[in-house]
Amino acid sequence: MSRIGLAPIAVPKGVDITINGQVVNVKGAKGTLEVELPEPITAAVEDDEIKVSRPDDDRKNRALHGLARSLVNNAVVGVTEGYTKKMEIFGVGYRVQQKGKDLEFSLGYSHPILIEAPEGITFAVDGATKLSVSGIDKQLVGQVAAYIRRLRKDDPYKGKGIRYDGEQVRRKVGKTGK
């Protein structure tokens, strides 16, 4: 059985926590996040720690307990440190350019692809083939990075496409022919 939900969340200096029913507001140096807790789960602030609790040991409540604790912890880390996903582009002629807050990709299609930065997300381009997606909301950063990766998924035969930094792509051998 996982015991993630039982661990208290340390609240660093400069972070304000406000609990209003099932909604936990986390305010820090980088911004403000709001986490809505699942129905039976409750949270309380005690001695610079957030404690998440469940009413009973029902199977569903145990699962939601760990989830709620992780969501609140992600919000605390997000407003203090933030989250970043680094990505690389591989392939001849594949590149990315920053246009203001947005990104413009050239990925071998007949047209360039423009990605607008959602609110709370910032893009940074390093050279023509490296980029990073940053923000305070872990879920939104991962979602935007996954959308960008989906524009041109890594090809297992040629190794061309967009991948996360450090991601290992399983290469396949092509047909041998006669």
Curated annotation (Swiss-Prot):
InterPro entries: Ribosomal_uL6-like, Ribosomal_uL6-like_a/b-dom_sf, Ribosomal_uL6_a/b-dom, Ribosomal_uL6_bac-type. The keyword Hydrolase does not apply. One of its GO terms (molecular function) is structural constituent of ribosome. Gene3D superfamilies: Ribosomal protein L6, alpha-beta domain (3.90.930.12). The keyword RNA-binding applies. It comes from the Bacteria. GO terms for biological process: cytoplasmic translation. Belongs to the universal ribosomal protein uL6 family. This is Large ribosomal subunit protein uL6.
